[in-house]
UniProtKB/Swiss-Prot annotation:
Substrate binds at residues 73-80, 140-142, 153-155. The gene is lipB. The active site is at 171 (acyl-thioester intermediate). This is Octanoyltransferase. The record marks 137 as: Lowers pKa of active site Cys. In the reaction, the free carboxyl group of octanoic acid is attached via an amide linkage to the epsilon-amino group of a specific lysine residue of lipoyl domains of lipoate-dependent enzymes. Its main location: cytoplasm.
């Protein structure tokens, strides 16, 4: 667990295109040192498919007019779009004294505990990172660790057009069904989901203080 006085800085980015946020994550990670602060970026993206480092082109079935971007995270192809909460933890896991597997577990548990606030029984799977409800995937994970620091993160389906998921094999699984929060009487908006996830994420990682920022610059 981190020190009790560890602060987590929350950046509320609103809706921003994927590539600009991705490159900002890379830049922050490349330039950080042992004094750099841990941040959690909360964002919503316009429609985009992102293909992880393990991704295979055959899992992109029919992208149509939605762009496909090859990125430097783990995992296979996924979809981001309006109505989906995306959260990027930019953490010094060396300083936190946790490994990547523990970080994945902590992220999954923060989602599970957030959904439990609404009476939704969600769970992770050992062989397929992410969070599931009744065998349907409600949240996807894909991380990258560089210099002992994390970037990329999670995507939670809240209230979105789910049809683009039918154009891919989500996370490389043909026929994988997806779920979202609103029909399950979970959080009804990305904003509501973000507020609750910030709470459970900071508790799961042991952060005692939160500081909020708007946009990518202070």
């Amino acid at each position: 667990m981190p020190l009790k006085d560890t602060v987590l800085h929350i950046r509320h980015l609103g809706r921003q295109d994927y590539e600009s946020v991705w490159h900002a994550m890379q830049e922050y990670t490349d330039n950080r040192d042992e004094t750099s602060r841990d941040e959690l970026w909360i964002v919503e993206h316009p429609p985009v498919f992102t293909q992880g480092q393990a991704g295979k082109s055959e899992h992109i079935l029919n992208p149509g007019d939605i762009p496909v971007i090859q990125v430097d995270r783990g995992g296979q192809v996924t979809y981001h779009g309006p109505g989906q909460l995306v959260a990027y933890p930019l953490l010094d896991i060396k300083r936190l004294k946790i490994g990547v597997r523990q970080l994945v577990t902590d992220i999954e548990q923060s989602i599970v505990k957030m959904l439990a606030l609404y009476g939704i029984e969600a769970y992770p799977k050992a062989d397929a990172p992410g969070v599931y409800v009744e065998e349907r995937k409600i949240a996807s994970l894909g991380l990258r660790i560089r210099k002992g620091c994390s970037f990329h993160g999670l995507a939670l389906n809240v209230d979105m057009d789910m049809s683009p998921f039918q154009r891919i094999n989500p996370c490389g699984y043909a026929g994988l069904e997806m779920a979202q929060c609103k029909p399950l009487k979970g959080p009804q908006s990305v904003e509501e989901a973000g507020e609750k996830l910030i709470q459970t994420f900071s508790q799961e990682l042991g952060y005692q203080h939160l500081e909020h920022h708007q946009g990518l610059t202070d």
